[in-house]
């Protein structure tokens, strides 16, 4: 699970980019006709939007200012370029300066070179929380889940302390459930079958996380899992579509757009499933039931009491799901593709199988056996290095004007990101564009403490860095290793006969495992039972 700032500038579908200015005004006209909105007020709002000048908040160069006579046209063109070409824009910006600005759907943001990562990660006046309000319009019903991003100590402390401490106890549950889920997806066919690594990873990991977060009964409820995975997939696209509209009109548009109405239904339906479970537990405890529950329902409640902070049980669960489902499944899906795309894939998979057998034989799953999966740890970190989750990362909001150590000025109210390019820096990683499976195993043998998958460093910020590094990365690492071990021991994998290397899907800041990619799997006899 990754408690990162997911979805900033995200767009999981391209429908918002295809909307265009013409279709936007057509939709606006339909509002006037269908709902008889006050024309003068609407015309006044549009006039302000069209002729509003771009405010200059910083002297840093602006990379994608766009062209057009009105700010709305410039903004639309900038957002369109941003959504489709962010890697190019970041490279262009870094070729000009170590700090620059990029126009994004939520405004003009500052992007910094990786050399600033440590300073940004530790600065007390740079925090991720307020970013969500701008990007996800958290004041609008349907998007209130994101209001807790970077602001809820209850969630972050529950993950950092309660979840991380339970990893060893949770391992038997995760491995037994993985066996059932994987068999339901890949079956036992002795012949090659084509599957989607992206869909398989999402299916398995969403259900594993649900079991950990809400317990056996609700965690296995297909309605609950469907609601949370659907919200996870659809909320980002809905936010991106909404951000095409000026802020003054967004509450009205959100009230009418089907995608936003659907988000509100998901929240309502999820609450109807969760609250009775919580009430039943409270009632049982009031009657003397001393049963202990090892799930996030209890961790959140206990942490809330210890911190003396309030929280919303449903919204907290939905945010945990967002942090967990997407990032972990993206890493697992990508590493399956990376293994299959290697010319020596059979050799590498064989080495991984030997390591799994050696680590588990005679002892089973425990903290030591997971730690002994050193080659797998390196393979996962190398996959994340070559295809991180995003082009820019470590989103932070400046609560006051900040002067960095080199004199760079960050105006108050600015959103700041770090360009995620250090992981391809040849000065840090020889042959940076080559997948080297044991790259980090070798570094660990030389005493490099940053060479572990869960290590956060300025040279590898796959899980962030500093005070707000992903607190759930230890759970995510264990979860992915367990599932990958089951996959490799029980199945052969390869690319389809006509398959080729598949590039990641670029969508705003996100670099996603290509959802259209396919691999072939067939059942094999595992050497040991796990």
Curated annotation (Swiss-Prot):
Group of enzyme by EC: oxidoreductase
Pathway stated in the Swiss-Prot or TrEMBL entry: Secondary metabolite biosynthesis; terpenoid biosynthesis
Localisation: Membrane
Protein name per its UniProtKB record: Cytochrome P450 monooxygenase ausG
Superkingdom assignment: Eukaryota
Co-factor requirement: heme
Protein topology in the membrane: Single-pass membrane protein
Homology family: Belongs to the cytochrome P450 family.
Note: In A.calidoustus, the austinoid gene cluster lies on a contiguous DNA region, while clusters from E.nidulans and P.brasilianum are split in their respective genomes. Genetic rearrangements provoked variability among the clusters and E.nidulans produces the least number of austionoid derivatives with the end products austinol and dehydroaustinol, while P.brasilianum can produce until acetoxydehydroaustin, and A.calidoustus produces the highest number of identified derivatives.
Pfam family, one: p450
Its job: Cytochrome P450 monooxygenase; part of the gene cluster B that mediates the biosynthesis of the fungal meroterpenoid acetoxydehydroaustin. The first step of the pathway is the synthesis of 3,5-dimethylorsellinic acid by the polyketide synthase ausA. 3,5-dimethylorsellinic acid is then prenylated by the polyprenyl transferase ausN. Further epoxidation by the FAD-dependent monooxygenase ausM and cyclization by the probable terpene cyclase ausL lead to the formation of protoaustinoid A.
Organism: Penicillium brasilianum
Positions of heme binding: 470
Stored InterPro entries: Cyt_P450, Cyt_P450_CS, Cyt_P450_E_grp-IV, Cyt_P450_sf
Residues annotated as transmembrane: 31-51
GO CC terms, sorted: membrane
EC number: 1.-.-.-
Molecular-function GO terms, alphabetical: heme binding; iron ion binding; monooxygenase activity; oxidoreductase activity, acting on paired donors, with incorporation or reduction of molecular oxygen
